[in-house]
């Protein structure tokens, strides 16, 4: 779907996505269906970046996304449950490492509320992981993100001056810098 925003096209998710797991289950080489679908986009160089927001599950659709990816940004909530999910994701990635060449670009700490100690604890625990990049940028809890999601607009369109809009722009610069290494 072309959007009114420069350099931004979207394929929106819908309730039909829940059928994908079922349909993939019956396919041969089901882990590579998305990669095959994206091949022509890569070959034609239509986009500089294709970002896929994966659901917080570890099923066949997520395996498809990881098999199609060159890099993975792993979001982790600044909360006790966020770290639990991160450990599960690393175990999952190790388990499918023979299927995918995706590399972890970095861990992005999200939903940071500096009134709580979780951000600091999360950062300290992540520092203990060898060879895992933790993005310098982190994303604060911000009601403007919820408003933008609810109204289907980028947060930078809703309010360019919000903290979260600036944080997402800073993250984009970090991602582009990583890609130019």
Where are these regions (language model features)?
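Active-site donor-binding loop signature of nucleotide-sugar glycosyltransferases
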Residues: 13, 137, 141, 160
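Short clusters of hydrophobic/aromatic residues that line enzyme substrate/ligand-binding pockets
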Residues: 24, 34, 145, 155-158
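Conserved catalytic-core segment of NTP-binding enzymes
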Residues: 39, 43-143
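C-terminal boundary of histidine-terminating zinc-finger modules
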Residues: 149-167
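C-terminal alpha-helix
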Residues: 170-181
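Active-site/binding-pocket entry motifs
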Residues: 16-17, 141-145
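Charged catalytic carboxylate motif
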Residues: 33, 85-88, 167
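Cytosolic-facing regulatory segments adjacent to core modules
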Residues: 1-58
């Amino acid at each position: 779907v072309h959007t009114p925003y420069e350099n931004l096209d979207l394929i929106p998710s819908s309730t039909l996505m829940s059928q994908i797991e079922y349909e993939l289950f019956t396919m041969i080489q089901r882990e590579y269906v998305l990669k095959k679908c994206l091949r022509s986009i890569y070959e034609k160089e239509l986009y500089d970046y294709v970002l896929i927001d994966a659901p917080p599950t570890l099923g066949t659709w997520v395996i498809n996304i990881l098999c199609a990816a060159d890099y993975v940004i792993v979001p982790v909530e600044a909360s006790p449950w966020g770290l639990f999910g991160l450990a599960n994701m690393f175990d999952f990635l190790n388990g499918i490492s023979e299927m995918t060449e995706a590399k972890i670009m970095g861990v992005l700490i999200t939903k940071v509320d500096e009134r709580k100690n979780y951000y600091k604890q999360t950062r300290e625990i992540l520092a203990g992981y060898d060879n895992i990049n933790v993005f310098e940028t982190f994303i604060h809890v911000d009601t403007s993100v919820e408003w933008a999601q609810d109204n289907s607009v980028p947060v930078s369109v809703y309010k360019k001056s919000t903290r979260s809009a600036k944080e997402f722009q800073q993250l984009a610069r970090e991602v582009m810098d990583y890609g130019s290494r």
